[in-house]
Design a protein with these regions (language model features):
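Catalytic-core segment of enzymes that process non-peptidic bonds
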Residues: 59, 63-70
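ATP-binding/phosphotransfer module of carbohydrate and carboxylate kinases, centering on a glycine-rich
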Residues: 13-22, 36-46, 68, 86-224
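Active-site glycine-centered loops adjacent to acidic/histidine catalytic or metal-binding residues
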Residues: 29, 55, 213
Length: 224
């Protein structure tokens, strides 16, 4: 469950401040990814952004009106647990059913691919097969990007972002991932929401979270 995390964050923050005698902030890694990209990456100059990381799960960060959406207890932005298949979905590790990350994470793609061919053991192998024109893999990718796009379309109708950022190891796949997601999201939302909407790959890769953590710390200190 997510709920003990706020207590854990406070405990870590207090312990580190006591040990080092310095101010400490604790933030969600996907939130930090989004902030890093806004500060010096692919989302510079944007005020309304949905950042999504695809990997073992789905992480996310939402910037609205130039401010990170954290919620009342700092738990906002858990996009992976947006329930896209609430009525008939598979079990999620959080205890609910039908969470988006069970369908949109890279691990969901790998699970589906492994049922077809054990050699497709990770994203790299799957995309290599897709680039070689394997029709089975291309069909799997089409179904997977459908799941990603449908979740994003719902969020677009709620937050009306100007930019959707896709992060994670697979985000380098422009033609096989980013472009299909962009087309499907725009086709799935009301026309006014699609106008001006961009979908881009994150630029900072593994550094995004660290860069965003610095930015989060600076913002927190400025508020205080």
């Amino acid at each position: 469950t997510l709920f003990p995390y706020t207590t854990l964050f406070r405990s870590i923050k207090s312990a580190l401040e006591e040990d080092f005698g310095l101010p400490v902030t604790v933030a969600n890694d996907a939130n930090c990814m989004t902030l890093g990209e806004v500060w010096v990456g692919a989302a510079q100059g944007c005020t309304d952004v949905i950042g999504v990381t695809l990997g073992t799960g789905v992480g996310g960060g939402i910037l609205t009106g130039g401010r990170l959406l954290e919620g009342a207890r700092g738990l906002g932005g858990e996009l992976g647990h947006y329930r896209t298949h609430a009525l008939d979905g598979v079990d999620c590790t959080c205890g609910a059913k039908g969470c988006w990350e069970r369908y949109a994470a890279t691990t969901a793609l790998v699970r589906a691919a492994q049922e077809k061919d054990p050699a497709w053991k990770d994203g790299r192998a799957i995309f290599a097969a897709a680039e070689a024109g394997n029709e089975t893999v291309l069909a799997l990718l089409d179904a997977w990007t459908d799941e990603i796009a449908q979740g994003l379309a719902g969020m677009v109708h709620i937050f009306n972002p100007q930019l959707i950022l896709i992060g994670g190891g697979v985000s380098a796949q422009q033609k096989l991932l980013i472009e299909p997601i962009a087309a499907k999201v725009k086709a799935s939302v009301m026309p006014a929401f699609a106008e001006g909407l961009e979908v881009r790959a994150a630029q900072l890769h593994n550094d995004a979270g660290m860069v965003g953590a610095v930015y989060y710390f600076r913002q927190t200190m400025e508020k205080e």
